[in-house]
Every structure is written in structure tokens, then in C-alpha cells.
Amino acid sequence: MEAVRGPIRAVGRVALAAMFISGGADALLEPGPRTAKAEELGVPLDPELAVQANGAAMLVAGAALALGIRPRLAAAVLAGSLVPTTLAGHPYWQVEDPAARRQQRIHFFKNVGLFGGALLVLSERPRARRRRPPRRRTASG
């Protein structure tokens, strides 16, 4: 089982990162729809800049997670970005229309699942760095 654990983790990280990469790129390149929500919440920065900064963080951390570059740090950034995004972006309990409320609830709990996935990555033990064997010196070198 140990031989399969590495590839399973790698595939899992890529699958988890996909939503962050996609959503982050979308927020970075087309912040418009999210900007109004940021304005409503009274974000202290320029709302468009705040949305784009959050999108950039999700994109970069998602890519790092997918590539296995500092996955625990990437997961921490992603988990941290999910809390305000989820609470601000999907407050289903405030929506009157039943169909819209159902959609917002789905997105809210999808984000809760992504948060859980990020916590699982955070809970992994750090990989042991492989040490290269010492180089042998030859008489000529």
C-alpha cells in the first residue's frame, strides 16, 4: 500500500487544486461579478483589487498544491481564503427564493468540502527530503 500512497496523494492534490485554479483565474481575469459582493461587505481595499488579489492567491496556491510545491503551505492559504469567500459569497440562509437558496447552499457546502480537503492536506506529515549519497572523490577529481 505504501507504494501507491504517493501517486494517490498526487492525484488527490491535483483534483483538489483544480477548482482553486479555475476559480482563481476567473476572479483574477474577470472580477466584475464578485466586486459588487465585496463592495456590499465593505472590504477596506478597492473591491476589484481585493477580488483579484484573492483570485491570484487561489491561483498560485492551487498551482503549488497541484505541483506538490509546499503543499501544506498551499493548503493553508487555500483554507484561509475559503472562509471569507464562502461566508460572503454563499450566504444561502439569507436567500428568499427557494431555487436560488438551494443553489447557494450547494455552493456553500461544496466550499466546506474543499475546506475539508485542504485540512486533510494540512494534516499530512511533511515528506522526508531525500538525501543524495555523498559524492566519491577520485584521484583525478
Question: Where do the PLM segments sit?
Answer:
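Short amphipathic, positively biased membrane-proximal segments
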Residues: 1-141
